[in-house]
Amino acid sequence: MPLYPIKLYVKHLPTLLCIGISLLLNIFTWIWLLIEIRPQTEPVFLHYNILFGVDFVGEWWQALYLPISGLAIIVVNAAMGWLLFSRDKFLAQILNGISLFCQLFLLFAAALLVFLNV
């Protein structure tokens, strides 16, 4: 089965909204983490557990794993959505919606990281 034209896939309104908002949230997460968690020699808190408190510390750049994983989720889901769009548009929209949902949770996790380290 031939691939759906990528220009038409990106111009589809639900796809455009989900991918666009996901990318904006990811860019905001990058900027926020880079502004708030600056390069430093002392370790930063990377994980907080309600039972044990801070249980994972590391280098400042390890906090950037959040937006990196978010970008990977966007790229993989958008590519899979494009491949599936000609067969099942609903499934492609679900994949892009999941990307948006993941970005919201990653932004929340970034907020916790920032407030834990500031």
Question: What are the residue ranges of the model-derived segments?
Answer:
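Hydrophobic alpha-helical membrane-insertion segments
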Residues: 18-31, 104-106
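Cytoplasmic juxtamembrane regions at transmembrane-helix boundaries
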Residues: 81-104
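Membrane-helix interface motif
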Residues: 34-45
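Alpha-helical transmembrane segments and their helix-start/interface "positive-inside/aromatic belt" motifs
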Residues: 9-24, 93-98
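Short, Lys/Arg-rich, polar N-terminal cytosolic tail immediately upstream
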Residues: 1-11
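Interfacial helix-start motif at the membrane-water boundary
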Residues: 51-71
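Juxtamembrane boundary at the C-terminal end of a transmembrane helix
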Residues: 108-118
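Transmembrane alpha-helical segments of integral membrane proteins
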Residues: 2, 71-87
